[in-house]
Amino acid sequence: MRTKQRNNLAETARHERVAQNTDVYAVKARNYKGLRRGSPVLCRNNWHIHHAKSGGGQILVCVAGRGYYQVEGKEAVEMKLGDCINIPAEVKHWHGAAPDEWFSHLAIEVPGENSSNEWLEPVSDEEYGKLQ
């Protein structure tokens, strides 16, 4: 059953390169949209929030390498191949590569009512330096 669901999603997904000289692709599948992103060593995004009146949020799926996901005020969670993280709307977080390893992941935006993304401050070198 899981394989069939994965195949159906793959059949309906459309990939488009969204940046030059990077491994970032836009993905559109049914009502979901997202990015397949490759992150070199030491790469991480800023803190951000996926807002929505209802529904919304983000799903992260590690497809290669090793990375981290962290909710503000909590310990970072290591992500390895196959790990899937469901982030509800209105949760401040960041995600990116481990300090010593490349990381590739799918970042899927969950459909929601009146959804938007708010990009915030960078993850500090001090915060990032705590990762193993």
Regions found by a protein language model. Give the residues of each.
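A short, N-terminal "cap"/entry segment at the start of jelly-roll beta-barrel domains
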Residues: M1-L35, N46, S116-Q132
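Short strand-connecting beta-turns/loops that link adjacent beta-strands
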Residues: R30-N31, S54, K74, D100-E101, ...
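Conserved short histidine dyad/triad with adjacent acidic residue
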Residues: R36-S54, A89
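A cytosolic small-molecule/anion-sensing beta-strand core signal
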Residues: G38, V63-A64, K80
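A short hydrophobic beta-strand segment most commonly corresponding to one strand
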Residues: I59, N86, D100-W119
